[in-house]
């Protein structure tokens, strides 16, 4: 087992996902889920855009980094190691009801997690 590191000052800053359609991603994360665009930078020489979105200040809360490679035409493969991004809410049942009304597909209705009691939905 490795030794512990002095993690004073460490924090989870962001997770990055690649998106094929940046505007559609903004629409979903910002308009539907209520996140804010914290910063967006185009890199013409590299032909990509990075956008950071979240619910709070980037310096205080974890956020999502959306990377849009301009030449990407096909959907990305999720791979077999990807799990999910958790967005917590006070009332998962109401959140799923509201999201369904907006056309969001709920793939797993709210209910207790397998082998547990915490209520989750996807």
What are these regions (language model features)?
Residues 25-30, 99:
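Conserved active-site tyrosine of GNAT-family acetyltransferases
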Residues 82:
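Flexible, small-/acidic-enriched active-site or ligand-binding loops
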Residues 1-9, 14, 38-42, 52, ...:
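Vicinal oxygen chelate
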Residues 17-24:
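Short acidic-aromatic low-complexity motifs
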């Amino acid at each position: 087992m490795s030794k512990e590191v002095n993690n004073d000052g460490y924090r989870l800053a962001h997770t990055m996902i690649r998106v094929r359609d940046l505007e559609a991603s903004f629409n979903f994360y910002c308009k539907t889920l209520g996140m804010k665009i914290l910063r967006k930078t185009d890199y013409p020489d590299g032909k990509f855009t990075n956008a950071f979105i979240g619910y709070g200040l980037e310096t205080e809360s974890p956020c999502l980094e959306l990377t849009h490679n301009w030449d990407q035409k096909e959907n990305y493969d999720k791979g077999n190691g990807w799990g999910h991004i958790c967005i917590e809410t006070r009332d998962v049942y109401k959140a799923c009801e509201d999201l369904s009304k907006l056309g969001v597909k709920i793939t797993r209705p709210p209910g207790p997690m397998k082998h547990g009691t915490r209520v989750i939905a996807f």
